[in-house]
Amino acid sequence: MSILFIADVHLCNTKPKIIHGFLNFLYNHAMQAQALYILGDLFEVWLGDDEKNIMHMTIAKGLQSLHKKKVPCYFIRGNHDFLLGPKYANLCDMILLPDSQVLKLPSGKNVVILHGDTLCIDDKSYQRLRNFLHCQILQKIFLSLPLSMRLYIFNCARTFCIKYKKYKLKQNLHIKLQTVIDMLIKNQSKILIHGHTHQPAIHNIQISENISFKRIVLGQWNKYGSVATINEKNDDINLIHFPLNKQ
C-alpha cells in the first residue's frame, strides 16, 4: 500500500469536471491507500466553515468515505483555504495538521510536508501579506462578519490581486533552495513534499558525494490530477499524473 499526497485541486462550482475527477479519485485510488495527505488549496476559496453549499457537502461525503474504509485523511491549509477550520474538517473526518509536519515512514525515514507558500521567501510582499492574514485576531473579526460581507471583501481583494499579478515577477514563485535544505536538515529529513507553485517535478538536490535530498513538487489539478505516492514497504517515490475524465 502507498501513502498519497495531493495539493492544489482548487475545487470550485465553476469547474465541475475537476469536482467529478476528484470524487472519482477518492472513491477509487484513495480507497486503496494507506493514508491521504492534502497539502493545501483543496478549495479555490474558503470564507468560513459556515459557508456550506452543495459542493462542500458533496466533497465532505467523499472524504467521509475514506474514514469509513479506515483510510486516514490529513489536511494542511493552503493560501486559498487557510480559513478552513475544525468544524468542516470534523464533518469530513479530516485531521488538521500545522503549516508544516514531519512524517515518519515505517522505515524510520522522515518526510517534511507543507503547502509550499512559506518557501517562496523572495516574494517579500506576499510573506508580509501572509503574516497579516494569519493574524488570529484579524481572522476572528473577519469570520464574525456576515457571509455576504466576507464575499464582498474577498471579491475586492481578488480584483486587486489579479491586477497585481500582472506586474509580479514569475521568479517570486520559485522556491529558495537554501530554505529547503535548512528545513530538511533541521528536521533530520532527506525528503520534502509540497505544492503551491504548480510546477510538478521531483528534484534531486546533491549537496556532496554522500549527502543528497529530494524535493517533490505536486501539480495543480486541471485536465490532469497530480498525486505523489510513497510505497510504505520500500520508500519508493513516484509522481503520477492522470486524466480526470479517464479514471
UniProtKB/Swiss-Prot annotation:
Taxonomically, which superkingdom?
Bacteria
Top-level enzyme category:
hydrolase
Which residues hold substrate? 79-80, 123, 165, 168, 196
Q: What is its EC number?
A: 3.6.1.54
Q: Which UniProt keywords apply?
A: Cell inner membrane, Cell membrane, Hydrolase, Lipid A biosynthesis, Lipid biosynthesis, Lipid metabolism, Manganese, Membrane, Metal-binding
The entry marks the following residues as binding Mn(2+) 2, namely: 41, 79, 115, 196
What does the entry comment about cofactor binding?
Answer: Binds 2 Mn(2+) ions per subunit in a binuclear metal center.
Q: Does the keyword NADP apply?
A: no
Tell me what topology the record assigns in the membrane.
Answer: Peripheral membrane protein
| Localization of this protein | Cell inner membrane
Give TM segment ranges: none
Alphabetical list of SUPFAM superfamilies matching this protein: Metallo-dependent phosphatases
**An annotated GO BP:** lipid A biosynthetic process
Q: Where does Mn(2+) 1 bind?
A: 8, 10, 41, 198
Query: Which reactions is this enzyme annotated as catalysing?
Result: UDP-2-N,3-O-bis[(3R)-3-hydroxytetradecanoyl]-alpha-D-glucosamine + H2O = 2-N,3-O-bis[(3R)-3-hydroxytetradecanoyl]-alpha-D-glucosaminyl 1-phosphate + UMP + 2 H(+)
Needed cofactors, names only, are: Mn(2+)
Pathway(s) where this gene product acts: Glycolipid biosynthesis; lipid IV(A) biosynthesis; lipid IV(A) from (3R)-3-hydroxytetradecanoyl-[acyl-carrier-protein] and UDP-N-acetyl-alpha-D-glucosamine: step 4/6
One MF term in the entry's GO annotations: UDP-2,3-diacylglucosamine hydrolase activity
**GO cellular component labels:** cytoplasm; extrinsic component of plasma membrane
A Pfam family per the record: Metallophos
Give the family this protein belongs to, as stated in its UniProt record.
Belongs to the LpxH family.
What the entry lists under NCBIfam families is as follows: lipid_A_lpxH (TIGR01854), PRK05340.1 (NF003743)
What is the stated purpose of this protein?
A: Hydrolyzes the pyrophosphate bond of UDP-2,3-diacylglucosamine to yield 2,3-diacylglucosamine 1-phosphate (lipid X) and UMP by catalyzing the attack of water at the alpha-P atom. Involved in the biosynthesis of lipid A, a phosphorylated glycolipid that anchors the lipopolysaccharide to the outer membrane of the cell.
Supply the name of the protein: UDP-2,3-diacylglucosamine hydrolase
Q: Which organism is it from?
A: Blochmanniella floridana
